[in-house]
Design a protein with these regions (language model features):
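RecA-like helicase/translocase P-loop NTPase motor core
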Residues: 1-208
Length: 208
């Protein structure tokens, strides 16, 4: 399991200009600093569990309630929540655990027979006493990746996050080209659609 930020503005970092130009104007969006966090998780046999999206908004406010009515959310293709900084907290990690990881262990798709082995980094929201107690009580063995080593031995950091974000960026750029609008803003609903489409695409990462 890992969390990764995703920005609403995913423009390419290159442009085309005449050789010798001293000034090059590049248009950007007003959303260039807007982001969400996504909690991703894959199993040892390549099963992709539903992504958990964290938006920047009031917790349990009208934005969260409206997003919860989307078909992708109601059909449990993904889960969403909100808080004021779009980062995970102990409460959010426990929601992820209860709605995604625990349900996977209890499902017929799981090969774990009720036991779980969870690998994650040592982010503050991952190592609270309450969350660890609940996870261990459910017969989970938990391994923490030491700080500074996630890019070497964290499976998602090493193999998944980059192709996922590259595919997400490609989806975003194609959408912007097809829309052909200046100052196009990506809605929260569209971001959910992007994330789910890319995550469940069997040609991008692992199997589904």
């Amino acid at each position: 399991m890992d969390e990764t930020p995703i920005f609403f503005n995913m423009y390419p970092n290159k442009t085309i200009a005449k050789k010798g130009n001293k000034t090059i104007l590049i248009k950007t969006q007003s959303q260039e600093k807007c982001r969400i966090s996504v909690i991703l998780c894959i199993t040892a046999d390549g099963e992709k569990l539903p992504p958990f999206l964290i938006f920047k908004a009031k917790e349990e406010g009208y934005i969260e309630k409206n997003l919860s009515e989307l078909n992708l959310v109601k059909n449990k293709k993904c889960y969403i929540t909100c808080n004021l900084n779009a980062w995970s907290t102990e409460k959010i990690i426990l929601r992820w655990y209860k709605n995604i990881w625990r349900k996977y262990l209890e499902s017929s798709e799981s090969l774990c027979e009720g036991f779980g082995y969870l690998i994650m980094d040592k982010a503050p929201s991952h190592i609270t006493e309450e969350s660890l107690a609940i996870m261990k009580n459910d017969k989970n063995l938990i391994s923490f990746i030491p700080a500074g080593l996630t890019r070497f031995i964290q499976p998602l950091d090493v193999s998944i996050n980059k192709p996922f974000k590259d595919a997400l960026k490609k989806e975003y750029i194609n959408y912007c080209i097809n829309m052909n609008e200046e100052n196009l803003k990506i809605t929260r609903e569209k971001m959910i659609e992007f994330v789910c489409k890319v995550w469940y695409d069997e040609n991008i990462i692992t199997k589904r």
